[in-house]
């Protein structure tokens, strides 16, 4: 088969860049999108011996499934690197689909991406690298950064005891994905590379176009892979949870209507309530035991504190006393100042903390992550209880 101009361009570029560089072995997670594709290409350019790895998570279409598998395989062929597909459907079903379903049934609003990062993606990638023995590192296309602990010496962070590796926000604040990575361990950080961490999104697209990557003009995915597969989160919920009729009740006690399951609601929700009231009403809380959706005026949605459970300290040792943090309680929201207090009267005092906000926050949602920062350093995070 005759080589296209793009084939020759890639071949010449990477062969010339690898002649003088020492080879290191790395596994790159490939979804078939432009970010992971460019990550692989940049690592080849930098002299790594790269192998692409794609996890088959769900049957059917989606960036993590059929189309993504084809694009990832084609990219590896273009780059002249090996490509491996792992069937991870069973672990994804157990660790993400099942736990997401259980969380909705409890009246929480879960964070499937964080579940997947902790228990599927990085776990599967690291295990694969370890089993190959000669592969020392893994990489993904996340917009986040990793630094050695010495980096913190340049900052005013004397109140923290830092671990060997620090997780930082991505340089592009509009694309920063560190919020979803709060559950990573030091073992993972010590072997992890984020090739796009210092880049802006527009630079990513330009670089991919310059290199002639087949995914360079592929539209960016805006949804969870669950949403891409099922069409919407609503359809996912309908498929996995049986409807159960209950009441929609104003916090003053007045019954305003009925619903077909608390799994269809989230704290702060206004649309889709199907009730009549002179003023706009919002979901205030969900009572799983009584199967009641409580609604209230917007002013009633504010909370000054929250209990955070299952806290993982990524970049610092567990604090033994209260600390001042910048807390981010949902993706895309701005961090807010707060005080974090260890709770010693819980069964597991090392993972449960009280977060007191400097200013009251609206729609603090159980099941979402509260992630703690000091400037650009991600200290740790946990689940809002």
UniProtKB/Swiss-Prot annotation:
Which Gene Ontology biological process is one annotated for this entry?
Answer: tRNA wobble position uridine thiolation
Tell me the InterPro entries matching this sequence: MnmA-like (IPR004506), MnmA-like_C (IPR046885), MnmA-like_central (IPR046884), MnmA-like_central_sf (IPR023382), Rossmann-like_a/b/a_fold (IPR014729)
The reaction(s) catalysed by this protein are: S-sulfanyl-L-cysteinyl-[protein] + uridine(34) in tRNA + AH2 + ATP = 2-thiouridine(34) in tRNA + L-cysteinyl-[protein] + A + AMP + diphosphate + H(+)
Residues at site: Interaction with tRNA? 142, 368
The residues annotated as the active site are 116 (nucleophile), 225 (cysteine persulfide intermediate)
The UniProt keyword set, sorted, is: ATP-binding, Cytoplasm, Disulfide bond, Nucleotide-binding, RNA-binding, Transferase, tRNA processing, tRNA-binding
Give all cystine bridges in this chain: 116-225
Name the residues that bind ATP.
29-36, 55, 141
Segments of this protein annotated with the region Interaction with tRNA: 175-177, 330-331
- Tell me the SUPFAM superfamilies matching this sequence: Adenine nucleotide alpha hydrolases-like (SSF52402)
Q: Looking at the UniProt record for this protein, which Gene Ontology cellular component terms does it annotate, in alphabetical order?
A: cytoplasm
Asked if the record carries the keyword Hydrolase, the reply is: no
User: Does the entry feature the keyword Cell inner membrane, yes or no?
Assistant: no
Which enzyme type, at the first EC level? Answer: transferase
Job of this protein: Catalyzes the 2-thiolation of uridine at the wobble position (U34) of tRNA, leading to the formation of s(2)U34.
Q: What HAMAP family is this protein classified in?
A: tRNA_thiouridyl_MnmA
Q: What's the protein called, per UniProt?
A: tRNA-specific 2-thiouridylase MnmA
Native organism is: Prochlorococcus marinus (strain MIT 9301)
């Amino acid at each position: 088969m005759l080589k296209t101009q793009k084939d020759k361009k890639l071949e010449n570029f990477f062969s010339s860049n690898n002649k003088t560089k020492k080879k290191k072995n790395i596994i790159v997670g490939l979804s078939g999108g432009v970010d992971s594709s460019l990550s692989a290409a940049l690592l080849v350019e930098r002299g790594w011996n790269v192998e692409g790895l794609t996890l088959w998570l769900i049957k059917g279409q989606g960036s993590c499934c059929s189309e993504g598998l084809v694009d990832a395989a084609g990219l590896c062929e273009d780059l002249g690197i090996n490509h491996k597909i792992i069937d991870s459907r069973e672990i994804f079903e157990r660790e993400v689909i099942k736990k997401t379903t259980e969380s909705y049934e409890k009246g929480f609003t879960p964070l499937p991406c964080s579940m997947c990062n902790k228990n599927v993606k990085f776990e599967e990638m690291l295990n694969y690298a370890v089993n190959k023995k000669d592969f020392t590192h893994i990489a993904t296309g996340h917009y986040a950064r990793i630094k050695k602990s010495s980096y913190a010496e340049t900052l005013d962070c004397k109140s923290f005891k830092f671990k060997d590796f620090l997780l930082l926000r991505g340089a592009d604040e509009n694309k920063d994905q560190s919020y979803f990575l709060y559950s990573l361990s030091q073992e993972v950080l010590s072997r992890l590379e984020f090739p796009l961490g210092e880049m802006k999104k527009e630079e990513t697209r330009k670089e991919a176009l310059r290199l002639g990557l087949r995914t360079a003009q592929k539209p960016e995915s805006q949804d969870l892979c669950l949403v891409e597969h099922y069409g919407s989160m609503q359809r996912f919920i309908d498929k996995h949870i049986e409807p159960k009729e209950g009441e929609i009740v104003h916090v003053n006690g007045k019954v305003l209507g009925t619903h077909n399951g608390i799994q269809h609601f989230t704290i702060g929700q206004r649309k889709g309530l199907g009730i009549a009231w002179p003023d706009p009403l919002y979901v205030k809380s969900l009572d799983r035991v009584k199967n009641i959706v409580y609604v209230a005026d917007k002013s009633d949605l504010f909370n000054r504190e929250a209990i955070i459970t299952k806290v993982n300290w990524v970049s610092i040792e567990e604090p033994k006393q209260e600390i001042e943090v910048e807390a981010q309680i949902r993706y895309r929201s701005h961090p807010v100042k707060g005080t974090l207090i260890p709770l010693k009267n819980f069964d597991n005092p090392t993972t449960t903390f009280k977060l007191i906000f400097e200013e009251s926050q609206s729609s603090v949602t159980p099941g979402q992550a509260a992630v703690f920062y000091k400037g650009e350093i991600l200290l740790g995070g946990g689940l809002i209880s």
